[in-house]
């Protein structure tokens, strides 16, 4: 029973960590990366579709993303979708390609993005602590129902605390890396 609770808590913590990685990946830095356009959708035959489902996305250089639509008629729609996204990008069409240059970040924008990163990190830490709280509550319920002994409950709580500490350390590493990436000029 205790092993199941720990396994469940670890799976939930892993999902929270993956969600944080996705959220941090959407925050634009000065460098181009293809994952930046993953959440941008375009209208494709009446259905909102991710750009990477209707075009090849690649890097031309460190500061430029190129988008090559599989259908020429999608050029305008994809360019418009990128321009209207909340990324602050200004794509241009060159022949059958869409070039998306990464504008350099201003110092003020870097600070704002750093605040966003810290906020996302704190939300992930809170999620980890909530998972810990739920697991500990489940252990207490088992103790009340006399399905486990006090020693087993205490050991389970210690294990869950170690798990929580490990995942929070992982969050801190992710945040430090993202902040360093943002502040690099």
UniProtKB/Swiss-Prot annotation:
A GO BP annotation: cytoplasmic translational termination
UniProt keyword annotation of 4Fe-4S present: no
Stored Pfam families: RRF
Localization annotation: Cytoplasm
Entry keywords, A to Z: Cytoplasm, Protein biosynthesis
Organism superkingdom: Bacteria
GO MF, any single term: ribosomal large subunit binding
Family stated for the protein in its record: Belongs to the RRF family.
Function, as annotated: Responsible for the release of ribosomes from messenger RNA at the termination of protein biosynthesis. May increase the efficiency of translation by recycling ribosomes from one round of translation to another.
HAMAP family documented for this protein: RRF
Protein name: Ribosome-recycling factor
Species assigned in the record: Nitrosospira multiformis (strain ATCC 25196 / NCIMB 11849 / C 71)
Gene that this sequence comes from: frr
